[in-house]
From Swiss-Prot:
Gene: ackA
Alphabetical list of Pfam families matching this protein: Acetate_kinase (PF00871)
Keyword set includes Glycoprotein: no
Protein name in UniProt: Acetate kinase
One cellular component (GO) term of this entry: cytoplasm
Chain residues that bind ATP: 11, 202-206, 277-279, 325-329
A GO BP entry: acetyl-CoA biosynthetic process
Function summary: Catalyzes the formation of acetyl phosphate from acetate and ATP. Can also catalyze the reverse reaction.
Length: 391
C-alpha cells in the first residue's frame, strides 16, 4: 500500500506486487476539520462518504475497515507492506528505508527543512504503526534520488560553514517522480540506464527539471526548498535574493509575508494576474490576453534555461522526458519548450505531440534526441521500494 499523508489529508493506493496492478485508490480529506470526506474506488466506481474524521489514526482505521467491508480485500493479512511518501530526508537518507523508531527520529530531525510536510508524513506513519504494528513500513523520500548530486551542484556559493553547521544546500524534490520516469524511459528506449543522459521535466503546479546521467541525478532545479528553480503555478522560482528586503521596504511586509507571497501569490498566478491553472492561462492566451501570453512565455523561458544548462553539464542529451499534469497533458507547453531545440538535435513531430496523459514518443524517427511523454507514477515507485525493503 502506498501512502501520502498531508496535514489534513491521506491519499492511498493498494497495489498487487510485483505485477504493479492497481487494486484500489482513494483519498481521505478534511481530517480534523469536522466534515471529513472519504473517497474510495470500488469496482471502478468512486464511492464518497462524508462524516467526521477527527484524526489520522481514525482515517487509517476507517480506510482498513472500508477495504474489507467493500470486499476489496478479504482480510488485513493481505497487506504485506506499507510505503510512506516522506518529503524531506535531508542528508540522512540517500535511499528508501525500513521504518524503525530511529528512522522516525531521523525524519523528525529533518522537520525544520520541511515544516509543512514532514510532521504530517510522520503522523501518517504513526497512525499505520498503531493499527498495523506488525506490517513492515518503508519511508520513500522525495529528496533521496538527488543525494547523488556532486558537491559542485548542491553547494550554494555562501560561506562553507553555513553548509556544515546548518545543512544549507540544494536538496531537490520530486525525486520519486524523476526516478520513476527515468527508469521507464530506459525501458522504452531499450537501452541500459547507465548509458543514458536524460532531461526529466516534471511540470505540474509544482515543477522541477532534473539532469539524470547514467541513472543518477547530477543536478535539479529546486533547491533548499521547493520554491527555487523554474516558474510554477503560484511559486516564483529563482529570484535575486536582494529583492526580499527591497519588497519588505516597499510593501511593509515582514520577511515571512514576502516568502508567503513568493510561495502562494507568484509564478503563473503573479504574472497572469488571474490564475495559477495553466489550462485557464492557455485559454486566455488563445483569446488574445497579453498577460496570459506573457505568463506562458516566462514559464517556457525558465524551462529553456535549465535544458540548455543541463545539456551542457552532461555534454549532450539522449532524451527529454515530459511528466506530471502539465508535462503529460499540455500540447501547447511541450511545443513551446521544444520549439528552437533543433540545434541540440531535437526534432519533434507536431502530430505526435497531440497525445495527452499516456506514454508516447513525440519525436521524428530521425531525431538524435528522443522526446517522451511518460505519465508519472510515484505510487508504483513507492510500492517497488516497499517490496525491495520489506522482504
Amino acid at each position: 500500500m502506498a501512502i501520502n499523508a498531508g496535514s489534513s489529508s491521506l491519499k492511498f493506493q493498494l497495489l498487487n506486487m510485483p505485477e504493479e496492478e492497481l487494486v484500489t485508490k482513494g483519498v481521505v480529506e478534511r481530517i480534523g476539520l469536522g466534515d471529513g470526506i472519504f473517497t474510495i474506488e470500488v469496482k471502478g466506481e468512486k464511492v464518497t462518504e462524508t462524516f467526521d474524521i477527527p484524526d489520522h489514526a481514525f482515517a487509517v482505521k476507517t480506510l482498513l475497515e472500508k477495504l474489507t467491508s467493500h470486499e476489496i480485500i478479504q482480510s488485513l493479512d493481505e497487506i504485506e507492506g506499507i510505503g510512506h511518501r516522506v518529503v524531506h530526508g535531508g542528508e540522512k537518507f540517500n535511499d528508501s528505508v525500513l521504518i524503525t523508531d530511529e528512522v522516525i527520529q531521523g525524519i523528525e530531525e529533518c522537520n525544520e527543512l520541511a515544516p509543512l510536510h514532514n510532521p504530517a508524513n510522520i503522523v501518517g506513519i504513526r497512525a499505520f504503526k498503531e493499527v498495523l504494528p506488525n506490517v513492515p513500513a518503508v519511508a520513500v523520500f522525495d529528496t533521496a534520488f538527488h543525494q547523488t548530486m556532486p558537491e559542485s551542484s548542491f553547494l550554494y556559493s555562501l560561506p562553507y560553514d553555513y553548509y556544515k553547521e546548518f545543512g544549507i544546500r540544494k536538496y531537490g524534490f520530486h525525486g520519486t517522480s524523476h526516478k520513476y520516469v527515468s527508469q521507464r524511459a530506459a525501458e522504452l528506449l531499450g537501452r541500459p540506464i547507465e548509458q543514458l543522459r536524460l532531461l526529466s521535466c516534471h511540470l505540474g503546479n509544482g515543477a522541477s527539471i532534473a539532469a539524470i546521467d547514467g541513472g543518477k541525478s547530477i543536478d535539479t532545479s529546486m533547491g533548499f526548498t521547493p520554491l527555487a528553480g523554474v516558474t510554477m503555478g503560484t511559486r516564483s522560482g529563482n529570484i535575486d535574493p536582494a529583492l526580499i528586503p527591497f519588497i519588505m521596504e516597499k510593501t511593509g511586509q515582514t520577511a515571512n509575508e514576502v516568502i508567503n507571497t513568493l510561495n502562494k501569490k507568484s509564478g503563473l498566478l503573479g504574472v497572469s494576474g488571474f490564475s495559477s491553472d495553466l489550462r485557464d492561462i492557455e485559454e486566455q492566451a488563445g483569446e488574445g490576453n497579453d498577460r496570459a501570453e506573457l505568463a506562458l512565455e516566462v514559464f517556457t523561458s525558465r524551462i529553456h534555461k535549465y535544458i540548455g544548462s543541463y545539456a551542457a553539464r552532461m555534454s549532450g542529451v539522449d532524451a527529454i522526458i515530459f511528466t506530471a499534469g502539465i508535462g503529460e497533458n499540455s500540447t501547447v507547453i511541450r511545443e513551446r519548450v521544444l520549439r528552437g531545440l533543433e540545434f541540440m538535435g531535437v526534432y519533434w513531430d507536431p502530430s505526435l505531440n497531440q497525445v495527452r496523459g499516456k506514454e508516447a514518443f513525440i519525436n521524428y524517427p530521425h531525431s538524435p534526441v528522443k522526446v517522451l511523454v511518460i505519465p508519472t507514477n510515484e505510487e508504483v515507485m513507492i510500492a517497488r521500494d516497499t517490496v525491495r525493503l520489506a522482504q
